[in-house]
């Protein structure tokens, strides 16, 4: 496929995803997503598709290419280590991408900063699942420009973002994203569990008029990188959602089945819908 054809295809895909995101400002999964492939819900056995979400112009003149994924499975989490089956080029194979792909959609998960003179070059993310190869092409296409606020809102179109207002915390939308910190974790031996605590704070400002506002702040713990499955003890899954962190802290416990290096992500989302990610690395012997 030529570069021009790829750009046209990506633009069409971005338009569909943006429409779905706009329909999803209430936090519910849009009907269109459930029928994304062929109307059949596959529990497992399907591929994972890398997604180029768009790009954000940075104040220093550089650009941030934003990526996510689409796991076609409804129940199966797919693990793809960095390497031939999960690689980004040029500059890879490791450019900070996830290796854990939970069911369905993972939005705005990581960014790759490219220089001012990036021009019409491309960053290509390749995923191969069960012999099926899918690619995402990151490029500075006009139709795929995002704002920083849209990225923090997970693609939801708040009133400020829809108006092109990207000055976080300004007078028309004073809401600032939450801050989050996680203490480092000492190496441990499997199958010993680890307790993780995120300290979270927020300004308490809600969303602008006409936008979605949640009642409480939420913290979601998730596996971002892992060599194999590991489960949060409260949920039994690869993620653990918590509402209204007690005393500004969200604590979870994770038990590992095998040695390796794990990256656990905490995502804090405030009442106005803005989110902040923080990762912590755990080495399991």
Where do the protein language model's features map onto the residues?
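Proline-centered linker/hinge motifs at extracellular inter-domain junctions
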Residues: 48, 144-184
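Residue-level recognition of secondary-structure-to-loop junctions
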Residues: 57, 251-258
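Short tyrosine-centred short linear motifs in exposed loops/low-complexity segments
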Residues: 61, 116-121, 191-192, 258-262
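Low-complexity "stalk/linker" and mucin-like segments enriched in Ser/Thr/Pro/Ala/Gly
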Residues: 98, 212-252
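Acidic, Ser/Thr
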Residues: 198-212, 222-224
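Short, solvent-exposed loop/turn segments at the edges of extracellular beta-sandwich modules
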Residues: 269-274
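C-terminal edge beta-strand
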Residues: 277-284
């Amino acid at each position: 496929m030529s570069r021009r054809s790829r750009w046209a295809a990506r633009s069409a895909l971005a338009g569909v995803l943006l429409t779905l995101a706009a329909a999803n400002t209430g936090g519910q999964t849009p009907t269109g997503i459930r029928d994304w492939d062929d109307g059949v819900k596959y529990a497992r056995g399907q591929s994972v598709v890398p997604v180029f979400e768009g790009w954000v112009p940075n104040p220093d003149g550089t650009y941030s290419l934003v990526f996510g994924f689409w796991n076609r499975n409804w129940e199966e989490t797919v693990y793809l280590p960095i390497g031939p089956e999960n690689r980004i080029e040029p500059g890879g194979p490791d450019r900070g991408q996830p290796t854990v792909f939970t069911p369905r959609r993972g939005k705005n998960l990581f960014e790759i900063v490219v220089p001012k003179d990036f021009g019409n070059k491309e960053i290509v993310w390749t995923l191969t699942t069960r012999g099926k190869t899918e690619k995402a092409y990151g490029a500075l296409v006009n139709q795929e420009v995002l704002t920083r606020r849209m990225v923090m809102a997970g693609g939801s179109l708040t009133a400020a973002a829809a108006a092109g207002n990207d000055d976080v915390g300004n007078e028309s939308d004073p809401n600032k994203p939450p801050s989050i910190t996680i203490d480092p974790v000492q190496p441990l031996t499997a199958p010993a569990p680890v307790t993780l605590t995120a300290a979270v704070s927020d300004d308490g400002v809600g969303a602008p008029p006409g936008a979605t506002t949640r009642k409480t702040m939420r913290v979601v713990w998730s596996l971002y990188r892992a060599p194999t499955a590991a489960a949060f003890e409260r949920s039994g899954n690869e993620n653990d959602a918590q509402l209204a962190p007690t005393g500004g802290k969200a604590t979870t416990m994770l038990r590992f089945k095998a040695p390796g290096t794990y990256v656990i992500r905490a995502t804090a989302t405030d009442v106005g819908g803005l989110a902040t990610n923080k990762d912590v690395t755990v080495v399991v012997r």
